[in-house]
Amino acid sequence: GGGDTSSKTDNGSKADNGSSDGAAKIEGSIVDDSYFGDEGTDSKPVTLKVWAPDAAVSLVKEQVEAFKKAYPKRKFKEISVVAQGEKDAATNMLNDATTAADVFSIPSDQLNKLVDAGVISQVAFKDAVTEANSEETVKAATLNDTLYAYPETNDNGYYLVYDKSVVSDEQAQTLEGILEACKKAGKKFIMNAGDGFYACTFAFTAGVKIDGLEKDGITQKFVKYDEDEAVKTLQAFAKLIKDYRGTFQSLDVANIASGFASGKCGAGIDGSWDTASNQKALGDNFGAAKLPTINVNGTDKQLISMFGYKYIGVNGSSKFPATAQILAHYLAGEECQLQRTEKLGWGPANKKVQESKAVTGSPVLKAIGEQSLNACVQVNIASTFWDPMANLGNKIIADTCDPSDAAAMKKLLNETISNVRDEG
C-alpha cells in the first residue's frame, strides 16, 4: 500500500485473501488498487460525501486526506466531510438515500431498519474486518450471516463523570453520595432523564430486561421480571430525585462539560464521545467511574445502562460503490481507530488498538468497560422503545410525582412496557 501514514501498521489481515475478499491483497486498511475498477480514473473522478459526528469532523477530514495519498493512482474530485449526529443518520438515510452520504456513522441499534429498507450495502472486505475487530462488534453487525457495517467503536455507552474537588472517589460509588456531595458544594448533578437512551436506566435497574424482538421482527420482547421489586426501585429513584430537587437536573449531556467549565456542575452521566471536552473542562480534577448504585430498601443496586457499538456504513445508492467501500474500510481501519482513540477518547473495536496504551491508560474507557458488564446491549431495539422510556424518565423526575404511591408507579411501569410493545 502507498501512503506513509497508513500502511505502517498491519492489522493481522495481510494473508487475507479469503472467500469474500477476492484474491487481491489486502494489507491492513489499504486494499489492492484493482478494487477501484473504473472509479477514480480520468473519465470517472470520485465524488463522495462522508457523514461524521460534529466532534470528529476535523479528524475525519485529515483521515480522508491520508486516504487520498494512500491511493496515488486514483483521481479524487471531492470527498466532503459533513457533520451529522449518528442518532439521526439512519432517519436521514431512510428519508432519502439518494441525497444522503455515501459513507456514514451509525449506532448498532439502527442497523436493522437500514438493512430492512435495503439502503445499506454489505461489507466488501468481510474477512479482513472480521479478523481485525472484536467478535462482539462483528456479531452485532451481522444479520442472516451477512456483515452490513464496519465496526468503529465498542464504547457507545455512558459513565459517571465527576469533579474530584466536589465528589470523592468513594462518594462516586453511590447515587446518594454523589447527590449529597453536589448539594453540599452548591453544584448540579446532570442526567438527561428525558431521553430514552439514558432513561431506560431506571427500568433496567428496576429489573426490566429486553430480549431482542418477537418473531414479527418489530415488537420488543421482554423477559419476565419481579414487578414488586421493579416498582420499589422506581419509587427509590423518584424519592431520591425529589429529596435532591434543585441538585438533580435533567438536561442534555452537552451541558455537563459546559457546567464543569463554568463551575455549576459537580457530576453527570455522560457518553464516551464527550470525553475530550470533559477532560479539558476539569483538568486534574477529572474523575470517571462506572455508574453508581442506588439504595432500594436497604440494598445497594447497581445502575444498569444501555450499551452498544458504533459502525461505519456504506450507502447502497452510492454512485461510487467501490470507492465508498474502500474508504469505509480505511476509516474503520486500525490506524484511524487508534487516532480517534488518542484524539477523541473513543473506545476502539479493533483488537490491536484495544491493547494500546491509549485504551489501557484511559480512566473513561476503563469505566465504560466496567459498566458494559452491567448493561443491556443496544441491538435489536424496537423503534418504539425510546419514547415510552423517555416518558418514564420525565414522569419519575416530575414535581407531580409522588414516590410513595406504589399503585401509580406500577401503572406507569405497565403503561411504559405496553407502549414500547405498541399495544395501545
Task: Enumerate the language-model features and the residues they cover.
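A structural signal for short loop-to-beta-strand junctions that line the ligand-binding cleft
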Residues: 91-95, 99-102, 127-162, 187-192, ...
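Glycine-centered hinge/linker elements that transmit conformational signals in sensory
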Residues: 219-250
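Short, well-ordered beta-strand elements
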Residues: 28, 32, 43-55, 74-81, ...
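Conserved C-terminal helix/tail region of periplasmic/extracytoplasmic solute-binding proteins
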Residues: 16, 369-424
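Hinge/lid segment of periplasmic solute-binding proteins
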Residues: 22-37, 106-158, 170, 176-179, ...
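Extracytoplasmic "Venus flytrap"/periplasmic binding protein-like
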Residues: 66-134, 165, 170, 259, ...
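Extracytoplasmic/periplasmic substrate-recognition and gating elements
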Residues: 280-343
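Extracytoplasmic/periplasmic solute-binding protein
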Residues: 148-152, 158, 177-223, 265
